[in-house]
């Protein structure tokens, strides 16, 4: 928005973007269309400064430190001093530009504009400390996965080979600062002996097809069968993790962790 008062005082209202306000300003220029040619500009500067810049604050207009730089004909480029960069962090910026010899132009191509160069703000002390903290050991290492082993055997309703379940809490494991979802999961594992056949966890029979008598699977003749997951039936566990305290997240998949079917192998 722009307005013009007496004695060549122009008022402009700028609204810096959220992107600009959230970053560190490294340079800023105000481009203003004077309408004056080079001779008129030189003559005006010989007697007194051609342009003056003020900012409207709650305490009234305050001067903005700046310097004039190279500019195309009929334009002026005002380079804001470093001390003025914080002005671009305000959602609304009202600038008063004094140019006694300039005239207001309604042409779109003569509209003044601000140019700001920015970069990401350096992290604060707390953020630097968080980011410099050594990363946690990779939780899916063999040593950590041993935490998911089955508990000591307890008397069960039946001792035959079957699929058992255990609720795993990532908070109890101390992984809740790394794994943010799910907070827990049901860990299935195979448990029991292979002295008697079990049909509990085998695939359901197909209608019209006679059931196949149970036979323990054996990979080595004469070897003793043990209760284990059927090959090819393990499913992955999907989790959402963070390594920087919640600033970013990553979806990960742990393969072959959840048992679906058990058998004597």
Swiss-Prot record:
Keywords: Cleavage on pair of basic residues, Disulfide bond, Glycoprotein, Growth factor, Hormone, Secreted. One of its GO terms (biological process) is hemoglobin biosynthetic process. Disulfide bonds join 161-227, 190-262, 194-264. The record marks 131-132 as: Cleavage. SUPFAM superfamilies: Cystine-knot cytokines (SSF57501). Dimeric, linked by one or more disulfide bonds. Inhibin A is a dimer of alpha and beta-A. Inhibin B is a dimer of alpha and beta-B. Belongs to the TGF-beta family. This is Inhibin alpha chain. It comes from Ovis aries.
């Amino acid at each position: 928005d722009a307005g013009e008062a007496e004695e060549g005082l122009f008022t402009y209202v700028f609204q810096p973007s959220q992107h600009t306000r959230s970053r560190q300003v490294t340079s800023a220029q105000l481009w203003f269309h004077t309408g004056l040619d080079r001779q008129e500009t030189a003559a005006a500067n010989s007697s007194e400064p051609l342009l003056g810049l003020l900012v409207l604050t709650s305490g009234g207009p305050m001067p903005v430190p700046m310097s004039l730089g190279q500019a195309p004909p009929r334009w002026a480029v005002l380079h804001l001093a470093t001390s003025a960069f914080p002005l671009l962090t305000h959602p609304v910026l009202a600038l008063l530009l004094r140019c006694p010899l300039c005239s207001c132009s309604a042409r779109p191509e003569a509209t003044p504009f601000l140019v700001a160069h920015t970069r990401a703000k350096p992290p604060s002390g707390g953020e630097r400390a968080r980011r410099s903290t050594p990363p946690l050991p990779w939780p899916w290492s063999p040593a950590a996965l041993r935490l998911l082993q089955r508990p000591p055997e307890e008397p069960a309703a039946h001792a035959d080979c079957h699929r058992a379940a255990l609720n795993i809490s990532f908070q109890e494991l101390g992984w809740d600062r790394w794994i943010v979802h799910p907070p827990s999961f049901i860990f299935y594992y195979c448990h029991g002996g292979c002295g008697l056949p079990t049909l509990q966890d085998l695939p359901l029979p197909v209608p019209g097809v006679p059931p196949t008598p149970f036979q323990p699977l054996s990979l080595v003749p004469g070897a003793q069968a043990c209760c284990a997951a059927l090959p090819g039936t393990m499913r992955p566990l999907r989790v959402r993790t963070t390594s920087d305290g919640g600033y970013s997240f990553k979806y990960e998949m742990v393969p072959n962790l959840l048992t679906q079917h058990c058998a004597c192998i």
